């Protein structure tokens, strides 16, 4: 008989008040490559925490060490108040893990797959409940090999949830999905948050982090370079908007300091012949920019504006676009 006893009731009194995850001084090398370089972070119980950064930043290595799948070279990792060498079996029963690439047996059906994963846990949720939760009820008898990419990702999430975990690791959960599938998966993660589960996810989609995460750590070259809520990190720019424009020839005659001297413009960066301006007031900055271009006889090829995002925070910290990092 399947037990659906809430995980909160299974947590020992010794765990009360402890963070879901604590990482101190984490280091990992692969030959001459430093994947993780003295990384520290703490995830509170019930928090959705995001590790953000480009491919190769060290996100996946960090999360695999936290999941007990990879050994670190140095540092301390405590998961739900315990270390992996204390009692790995008991700890693994309390976790849900969705890998960046989850290879499921393609000849099994959806129901058979979830039932298989349910058998790994002494307690958990019912197979039917989890299948319905990830909106695969109509596909319960379909073989995994016949599912779409988005459906396979939802099935992988079901396998991570079926043990009713206290802490769930999601590594790049929406990579490769179309926009509709991404949003469907976002809705499922939001439901998990509402249930009080602790979630650690990695992503290089800044909009995903802004939508889902209570706090984020921006990781670059194996280090945390910024930590906080999405709102506070964006506010740290000191600019509410970003103006991006291209003007042929401007990169040869304009300097960043000259643009920063214009009314309403806080900072200016040139990247691949395109300027990005952090501005405090669009109504002042855009007219000032247009006047300056006209004064210099420079043509305006394109101009777009958007509210400041975590992507802009990353660019401000590193001088690189996330997609180019």
Which functions belong to the PLM regions below?
Residues 1-27, 320-325:
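ABC-family P-loop ATPase nucleotide-binding domain
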Residues 18-23, 28-226:
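ABC transporter nucleotide-binding domains
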Residues 84, 120, 248, 282, ...:
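Short beta->alpha junction loops/turns
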Residues 96, 122, 235-239, 264, ...:
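A generic structural signal for secondary-structure junctions
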């Amino acid at each position: 008989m399947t037990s659906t006893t809430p995980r909160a009731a299974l947590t020992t009194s010794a765990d009360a008040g402890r963070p879901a995850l604590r990482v101190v001084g984490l280091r990992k090398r692969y030959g001459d490559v430093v994947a993780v370089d003295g990384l520290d972070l703490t995830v509170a119980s019930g928090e959705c925490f995001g590790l953000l950064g480009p491919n190769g930043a060290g996100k996946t290595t960090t999360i695999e060490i936290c999941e007990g799948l990879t050994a670190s070279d140095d540092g301390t990792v405590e998961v739900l108040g315990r270390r992996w060498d204390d009692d790995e079996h008991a700890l693994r029963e309390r976790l849900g893990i969705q890998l960046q690439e989850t290879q499921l047996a393609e000849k099994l059906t959806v129901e058979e797959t979830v039932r298989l994963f349910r058998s790994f846990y002494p307690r958990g949720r019912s197979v039917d409940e989890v299948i319905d939760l990830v909106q695969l009820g109509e596909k319960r008898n379909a073989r995994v090999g016949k599912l779409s990419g988005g459906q396979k990702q939802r099935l992988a999430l079901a396998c991570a949830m079926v043990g009713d975990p206290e802490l769930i690791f999601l590594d790049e959960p929406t990579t490769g999905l179309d926009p509709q599938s991404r949003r469907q998966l976002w809705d499922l993660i939001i439901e998990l948050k509402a249930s009080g589960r602790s979630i650690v996810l990695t992503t290089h989609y800044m909009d995903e982090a802004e939508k889902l995460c209570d706090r984020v750590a921006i990781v670059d070259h194996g280090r945390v370079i910024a930590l906080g809520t999405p709102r506070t990190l964006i506010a740290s720019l000191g600019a509410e908007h970003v103006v991006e424009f291209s003007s042929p020839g401007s990169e040869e005659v304009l300097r960043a300091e000259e643009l920063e001297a214009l009314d309403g413009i806080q900072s200016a960066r040139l990247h691949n012949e395109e300027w990005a301006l952090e501005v405090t007031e669009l109504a002042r900055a855009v007219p000032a920019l247009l006047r300056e271009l006209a004064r210099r006889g420079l043509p305006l090829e394109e101009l777009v504006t958007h509210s400041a995002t975590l992507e802009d925070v990353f660019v401000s910290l590193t001088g690189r676009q996330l997609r180019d990092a």
